[in-house]
Curated annotation (Swiss-Prot):
Belongs to the VPS28 family. Residues 124-220 form the VPS28 C-terminal domain. Component of the ESCRT-I complex (endosomal sorting complex required for transport I) which consists of TSG101, VPS28, a VPS37 protein (VPS37A to -D) and MVB12A or MVB12B in a 1:1:1:1 stoichiometry. Interacts with TSG101, VPS37B, VPS37C, MVB12A and MVB12B. Component of an ESCRT-I complex (endosomal sorting complex required for transport I) which consists of TSG101, VPS28, VPS37A and UBAP1 in a 1:1:1:1 stoichiometry. Interacts with VPS36; the interaction mediates the association with the ESCRT-II complex. Interacts with SNF8 and VPS25. Interacts with CEP55. It comes from Mus musculus. GO terms for molecular function: ubiquitin binding. This is Vacuolar protein sorting-associated protein 28 homolog. GO terms for biological process: endosome transport via multivesicular body sorting pathway; negative regulation of protein ubiquitination; positive regulation of protein catabolic process; positive regulation of ubiquitin-dependent endocytosis; protein transport; ubiquitin-dependent protein catabolic process via the multivesicular body sorting pathway. It is found in: Cell membrane; Late endosome membrane. GO terms for cellular component: cytoplasm; cytosol; early endosome; endosome; ESCRT I complex; late endosome membrane; plasma membrane. The keyword Magnesium does not apply. It comes from the Eukaryota. Gene3D superfamilies: 1.20.120.1130, 1.20.1440.200. The modification N-acetylmethionine is found at M1.
Amino acid sequence: MFHGIPATPGVGAPGNKPELYEEVKLYKNAREREKYDNMAELFAVVKTMQALEKAYIKDCVTPNEYTAACSRLLVQYKAAFRQVQGSEISSIDEFCRKFRLDCPLAMERIKEDRPITIKDDKGNLNRCIADVVSLFITVMDKLRLEIRAMDEIQPDLRELMETMHRMSHLPPDFEGRQTVSQWLQTLSGMSASDELDDSQVRQMLFDLESAYNAFNRFLHA
């Protein structure tokens, strides 16, 4: 009936403008992309920490669960901020102002550098939980960054073992303690400058990840 009558694009329709269908990119090269990715990671960590603080205030998580999660986020925050810190961003306060990030509870945790459950007493249970989480992550991060010399790994691993020993709540046969002990024995048979080979690094990462997950399961039990 209307053969031959051209269709009229609706109001606001792009019509024949292919440029309007092109993907808009925030970056021009790989360096800029990494910069934005790093800022996004820092933004996400701060927002997650703010949500965790609110959840703890509302009794949605137990003190042990909160302590472990907050300790992990503080480690992640430090790593994320190092990637962003520079001439444009000199402090976390400046980052929050620039991106209108209103997270006062998270900022308080970051400035105190410890979960709210932790006291100054090193024998405090929550202090031990925080230290165990932090040390697990520190050792695994070193291995992922190919830091594998005996004298660079053993001190943190020994401190991890000693901290777990201070936790009387951990059962004597806790698998994570046994895993760390076995790797300490392996490292003690090496010279300071000796390095773990690729196979050992892969196995150690697997073992520590399993031990870390077991520790988290213990906290949630």
